[in-house]
Every structure is written in C-alpha cells, then in structure tokens.
C-alpha cells in the first residue's frame, strides 16, 4: 500500500489523499500489482465543511475491495462558489487519468462517490461535465467525465425539497434565483450521465428522500442505468452505518457491499 497526498494539476486550495495498491515505496508489476479501477470520495458537509466521517471510513471499504482510492478535500464556505469545488474534482479525475499508467489505474473505470453535499459535488461532475457554463469556467479540455457515480443521501434538487444551505453555498446565490435553480442537478441529466448508484433513507429530514427519487426519475427518463435503495430508517449523515462513525445501523450498512457489487458489475472487475 502506498499513501500520499497531492494537489491536482492546474488547480489550488485543495488536496487529495491517495491510497494505491502496491509496494509502499514504488509500484511495479508483480503478482499483487495490476491495473485497477479507482474511486474518488467526496465527503459531505453542506459545502460549509468537509466531514471526516465520510472520508477515510468510506475510502477504506473501496480500497479493501481492490480499488485505488482517493479522498478529495475540497474548498467550502465562501470559496465554494464559482465552480471551485467542481473544478477541483474535475482536476482530480484528470490528474488520476494522467497518472493512470504510473499508478496502475484503469483510466476508463474511475468512479466518484459523494455524501450529502459531497453527493451534489460528485453528481455535478457526472451531469455538468459537458455543460458550456461549467466548461467555460474550467477552461481546460481534459477528459473529466466519471465512469460511474455512487451517491449517498445526495443533495440534488433546487426546488422545495432542496437543502437550501448547500445550494446557496455552491451557487453563491439566494434561494429561488435563476442561478440557484441552475444547480438542481436532476434538470441536467442526459444520456451521457454515467451509470449511478443511489441510496437514501425515508426518514431523512435534512435532505429529503425526494432528492434521490427525482434523480432516479431523471435517470430513467434519459435511459441511464442506475440502481437505487430507499431504506426505511435512519436520519441524515449516517455514512457507512457502523460504530466507527457512531451510527451503527447494521441493516443500512449493507449499502456499502451493494455499491461495491454494483460497481464491480458496471466495471466488469473482479479481485
């Protein structure tokens, strides 16, 4: 295992923690080092902070499943507007693809995972990667489309079911304005949106389940493959649903295994 941090090429004010399979000091082809898919984790926090509970506790599950894993520590608060977190995520996936050979990563099997506002960030990459408004702000022509998305109780809509604080932070606009509404991601889904895994709880009063339901409806209309699980119990922010993150929901914790099995199917990957 090799663990290190980097700042993606062409961006600033963020860092990425990388967990790579292979020799601790260098990676070389061997019986235990071969090309693998990758997962980029975007913790939540309302675009006001970055949750530790949705970072390493999540990443280690995908690493254990054989994925090269990355955690993005993106900009929040006043720095969350002007597409900065999304430019940071786009730069991260471009950086991973640029180093794919060196890191034994399969460049067309890179997924993004996000929780709550981090789910909005991950989903933004999957739905806005080809939007002229974002591309103008990004100013680069890198391959930034993720190959799959895993969205956990994500912030999606900018309507009556929106998590207003998240959308205000990322849009830099007041509730109900056109700029605010533009960040309703279900309105940007099209046939190029990547395959998506969604899960939410019916009891979530912070980010209502309608966010995932509307995303699923949009994916279905665009004929994008997806899998969705609505679990009956559990409030917002339960992460991997175990004692490590202080939300031990053994029933709900199954989402982790489900998402890995789904990704393995989409990526045709077996360890």
Task: Locate the predicted segments by residue.
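Conserved alpha/beta-hydrolase "acid-adjacent" motif
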Residues: 205-214
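Short beta-strand element of the alpha/beta-hydrolase
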Residues: 35-44
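Short beta-strand/loop motif that positions the catalytic acidic residue
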Residues: 192, 198-200, 204
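Mobile cap/lid helix-loop segments that gate and shape the active-site cleft of serine hydrolases
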Residues: 154-188, 194
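Primarily recognizes the serine-hydrolase "nucleophile elbow" in alpha/beta-hydrolase
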Residues: 94-164, 180
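N-terminal cap/lid segment of alpha/beta-hydrolase-fold proteins
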Residues: 1-34, 164
């Amino acid at each position: 295992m090799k663990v290190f941090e980097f700042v993606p090429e062409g961006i600033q004010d963020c860092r990425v923690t990388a967990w790579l399979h292979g020799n601790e000091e260098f990676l070389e082809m061997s019986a235990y080092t071969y090309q693998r898919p990758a997962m980029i984790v975007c913790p939540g926090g309302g675009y006001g902070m970055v949750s530790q509970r949705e970072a390493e506790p999540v990443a280690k599950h995908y690493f254990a499943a054989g994925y090269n894993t990355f955690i993005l520590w993106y900009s929040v608060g006043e720095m969350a507007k002007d597409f900065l977190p999304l430019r940071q995520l786009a730069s991260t996936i471009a950086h991973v693809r640029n180093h794919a050979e060196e890191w034994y990563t399969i460049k067309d099997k890179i997924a993004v995972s996000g929780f709550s506002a981090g789910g909005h960030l991950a989903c933004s990459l999957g739905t806005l990667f080809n939007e002229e408004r974002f591309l103008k702000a990004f100013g680069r022509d890198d391959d930034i489309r993720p190959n799959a998305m895993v969205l956990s109780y994500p912030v999606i809509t900018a309507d009556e079911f929106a998590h207003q604080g998240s959308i205000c932070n990322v849009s830099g606009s007041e509730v109900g304005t056109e700029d605010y509404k533009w960040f309703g991601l279900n309105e940007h889904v099209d046939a190029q949106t990547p395959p998506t895994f969604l899960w939410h709880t019916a009891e979530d009063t912070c980010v209502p389940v309608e966010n995932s339901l509307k995303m699923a409806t949009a994916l279905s209309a665009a004929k994008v493959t997806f899998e969705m699980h609505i679990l009956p119990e559990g409030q917002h922010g339960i992460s991997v649903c175990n004692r490590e993150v202080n939300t031990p929901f053994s029933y709900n914790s199954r989402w982790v295994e489900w998402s890995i099995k789904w990704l393995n199917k989409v990526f045709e990957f077996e360890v």
